[in-house]
Amino acid sequence: MVKEFFLNILSLIKNALVKFMKFFNTHFNRTTLKTKSILKKIEKNKENINVAMSNLSGSASIFYIWKAKDLKKYEDVLKHAGKSSFDLKYKEFEMDLNENNHYLEIPLTMSLDLKYVVEKSFEQFNASKNFAKSFKISSDTMKGASETSIKFATKEIEAEKIKENQRLVNDLNKLNILYRKVINNSLKSHNELLSKVEEYIK
């Protein structure tokens, strides 16, 4: 019984990580390769870019960079999952994510270094990736253990303990929605910036 219990936990964690790494390989690695390609193009076409930038006129375009590092203060929300303090911590995280402006605005001027803009955005992109990876692994481990505890519940396990595990699973599912929002905002912001930069290095 105990052996089967732990094998179930390991199986759930393994399956979750396989899916997560597939997501990473598909989206993050593709964006990373595109970033490196654009940085090479900037270096290769430096003179042409400088000429194009010096001829800029009219109102300046704005580059928007998603500031993932703003959210590092919420990394400990995971510790509150399943506890009475979770609702307040979750609400703070959700409100900050929805209501606050997490974008760094950089106007495009003739003195602007495109390489700096791409690297600055890539830095935030990687911060988001690390935040998500750490969160996802911890979350899936906790969730796998709780779901298995519920599945293997017997009369020896108190009903209150089952309820606690179910609450933890529910809290982690709610957090998963916010985690995905952080990821999607980061991917969208960085890819849009790369597309915008590409217009100046053709």
Question: What is the predicted function of each stretch?
Answer:
Residues E4-K19, F23-R30, K34:
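Low-complexity, intrinsically disordered, cysteine-poor segments enriched in small/polar
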Residues K36-K202:
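Long, low-complexity or tandemly repetitive, helically biased scaffold regions used
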